[in-house]
């Protein structure tokens, strides 16, 4: 039996999130498309309540030891409790593989729960929940400078992408 895919790289995948910060709530749309050399291009578009938007694109690829975004590990493989990695100033650790998450897009079981400390815990902490076959479904961050919550609100296929 293969390990669950907690961060699927699927051209055509479209995920929509509500991102709540102290000053406002934005919509985040994440769309995946085919990239060079077997990678996936991930486009993230944040839209503010006034309609203003900003977009960034990243190259994401699966390697033997993890999933990498623009060359930096964002999730270790295989995913096992206790596995650790860092993206300074954050230090991550897989805390569990049996977490549950409730979001506007549905209820998810068997989730990977990754916890993190910001600047060794001096600047805050957070947790991310990744559902098998879906990816990130919830994140709560108590960053002292800018706390936020990310919740999955919808998932489907990107317009113009054929189903695979």
Residue spans of the language-model regions?
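Conserved functional acidic sites
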Residues: 1-164
């Amino acid at each position: 039996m293969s390990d669950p895919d907690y961060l699927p790289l699927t051209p055509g995948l479209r995920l929509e999130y509500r991102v709540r910060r102290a000053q406002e709530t934005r919509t985040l749309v994440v769309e995946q498309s085919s990239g060079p050399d077997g990678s996936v291009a991930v486009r993230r578009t944040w839209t503010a309540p006034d309609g203003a938007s900003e977009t960034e694109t990243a190259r994401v690829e699966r390697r033997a030891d993890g999933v990498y975004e623009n060359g930096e590990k964002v999730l270790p493989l295989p995913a096992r409790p206790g596995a650790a990695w860092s993206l300074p100033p954050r230090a991550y650790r897989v805390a569990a593989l049996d977490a549950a998450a409730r979001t506007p897009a549905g209820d998810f079981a068997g989730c990977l729960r990754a916890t993190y400390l910001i600047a060794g815990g001096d600047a805050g902490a957070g947790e991310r929940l990744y559902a098998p076959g879906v990816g990130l479904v919830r994140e709560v961050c108590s960053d002292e400078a800018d706390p936020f919550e990310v919740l999955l609100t919808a998932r489907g296929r990107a317009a113009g992408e054929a189903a695979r």
